A protein has these predicted regions:
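Acidic, metal/ion-coordinating pockets
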Residues: 1-299
Length: 299
């Protein structure tokens, strides 16, 4: 029933695509297919097949987002399940990535991935603009310094990641602004630490007789300048923003109604459910709303 609540809320909120991963098959293929029928958005996967090697889902979708063609591919790292066969993800990606790229201004990969497959994907030269990955507890601060920006949004549903893409020339690579903004910020912090509280200090003069420190200063200044140049010269850009889904977020009444109705059905069937991690036997009454899905009441 919890899965039904999630699907029903996304039906109202809007969703371009869902790419299932290993955890989504915990209740079996039949359950996934039931949720797929309930959803008014597509389930996609290029490499989750039935046991005979036939596709269970469309491998990708092309979405029109404000006049920009966005190709979205679904992919998963290998996992073992009696109901499905998982094709090698890099092999599956290689078979269709050019087909999707030819139809897209922007190509996004939704990847339920092991780190080893991310590394293989990064070194394969695929024309992918952005990777949004699951199967990782990390909450990315930027997309990393490899060729393709790769973001992990964590596993608790506590944050909403927003990606604003500026497309000036679909044939040019995207610049992940967060990488260079973080590079500048970290270098500035190191320089300020060397200033020891006096932000107008001339570091070159202070450390003129300390060659190792001068070398550090030059390195940090070079990092700042190279980041500024990258930001200035970017043609297409990705700007990431994170939004904490806490008490300051105003609930949409229609979404809250779906959640509360779903919880009421669960309580009718199984009795009141405690937050995740509650020891057996503890009081399960007065459980508040858990709108971010982490099992902890928000209010």
């Amino acid at each position: 029933m919890t899965a039904e609540i999630i699907v029903s809320t996304f039906n109202e909120i809007g969703c371009h695509a869902f790419s299932p991963g290993s955890k989504d098959f915990a209740a079996g293929l039949g359950f996934i297919q039931e949720m797929q029928m309930l959803a008014n958005f597509p389930f996609i996967s290029a490499n989750i097949l039935d046991v005979n090697g036939n596709r269970l889902f469309d491998p990708y979708v092309i979405a029109d987002v404000e006049g920009v063609s966005v190709g979205i591919i679904g992919l998963a790292s290998n996992f073992i399940h009696s109901d499905v066969y998982i094709q090698d993800p890099i092999e599956a990606l290689n078979e269709l990535v050019d087909e999707v790229s030819s139809q897209s201004d922007v190509l996004v990969l939704m990847f339920d991935s092991e780190e080893a497959d991310i590394i293989k994907m990064q070194t394969s030269g695929f024309p992918i603009d952005l990777v949004i990955r699951s199967k990782s507890k990390t909450r990315s601060q930027d997309g990393g310094k490899r060729d393709i920006p790769s973001y992990s949004c964590g596993d608790r549903g506590k944050y909403l990641y927003q990606f604003d893409l500026t497309v000036a020339d679909p044939n040019e690579q995207f610049t992940d602004l967060a990488v260079y903004e973080n590079q500048m910020s970290q270098a500035e912090k190191k320089l300020n630490k060397m200033r020891k509280g006096n932000l107008i200090t001339d570091l070159h003069n202070v450390y003129k007789d300390d060659p190792p420190s001068l070398k550090k200063i030059e390195t940090y200044e070079s990092q700042i300048q190279s980041a500024k140049d990258a930001l200035k010269n970017s043609v297409n850009s990705i700007k990431m923003s994170k939004h904490e889904l806490g008490k300051t977020v105003t609930d949409r009444p229609d979404i809250l109604r779906i959640v509360d109705d779903g919880k009421a059905k669960i309580n009718e069937s199984f009795g009141p459910q405690p937050p995740s991690g509650t020891p057996p036997g503890q009081n399960q009454k007065n459980i508040g709303h858990d709108h971010d899905g982490d099992g902890i009441p928000d209010h």
